[in-house]
């Protein structure tokens, strides 16, 4: 039996709309849900196997994308949010009641500072960028997944057209390396 990766992948990937203008994310609380308005579409939307990202119940992976932080605004019940681990690079703001991660923000110097991490499946609107790749695939082993099953996981991703990586995609790794070289003075600040 094939593993459950994530509903947005297992149920068939729906192509997003490149002109999509954003929408509202809602936590899972039936009463007074936290609402976060995203003022645009996400980029680099991907399946993530790390142990820190929020995943729907029964899923091995989260699906997470990034959006400029100035396009992220909490519009309802902000008092219900708390940071799960304030020592982490990505400060994941989750609902205290239902546990859903609403957005992750980086405050420390980092190549992705200025981008917030969000789960667009929390929105009813259609048009969000579809998953582009799968990252940190081997990390599911750290969470108790039998390593003998990882080839099957990779095959399942490839069957829906997603490339798999054990870090991030090459484009994102290049961005991280470029930022690091710029910080160390090995590359000019503007390329």
From Swiss-Prot:
Entry protein name: Putative glutathione-dependent formaldehyde-activating enzyme
Its EC number(s): 4.4.1.22
CENP-V/GFA domain mapped to chain residues: 20-166
Listed SUPFAM superfamilies: Mss4-like
Record pathway: One-carbon metabolism; formaldehyde degradation; formate from formaldehyde (glutathione route): step 1/3
Cofactor binding note of this UniProt entry: Binds 2 Zn(2+) ions per subunit.
A molecular-function term among this protein's GO annotations: S-(hydroxymethyl)glutathione synthase activity
Species classification: Eukaryota, Fungi, Dikarya, Ascomycota, Pezizomycotina
Keyword Zinc belongs to the record: yes
UniProt-annotated binding residues for Zn(2+) 1: 27, 29, 95, 98
């Amino acid at each position: 039996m094939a593993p459950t990766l994530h509903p947005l992948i297992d149920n068939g990937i729906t192509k997003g709309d490149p002109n999509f203008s954003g929408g509202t994310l809602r936590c899972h609380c039936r009463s007074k849900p936290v609402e976060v308005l995203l003022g645009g579409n996400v980029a680099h939307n991907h399946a993530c196997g790390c142990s820190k990202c929020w995943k729907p119940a029964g899923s091995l992976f989260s699906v997470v994308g990034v959006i400029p932080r100035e396009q992220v605004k909490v519009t309802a019940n902000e008092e219900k949010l708390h940071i799960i681990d304030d020592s982490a690079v990505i400060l994941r703001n989750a609902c205290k009641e239902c546990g859903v991660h609403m957005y992750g923000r980086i405050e420390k110097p980092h190549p992705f500072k200025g981008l917030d991490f969000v789960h667009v499946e929390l929105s009813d609107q259609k048009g969000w960028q579809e998953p582009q790749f799968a990252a940190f695939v081997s990390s599911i082993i750290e969470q108790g997944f039998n390593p003998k099953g990882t080839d099957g996981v990779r095959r399942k991703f490839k069957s829906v057209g997603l490339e798999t990586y054990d870090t991030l995609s090459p484009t994102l790794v290049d961005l991280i390396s470029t930022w690091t070289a710029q910080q160390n003075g090995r590359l000019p600040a503007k390329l």
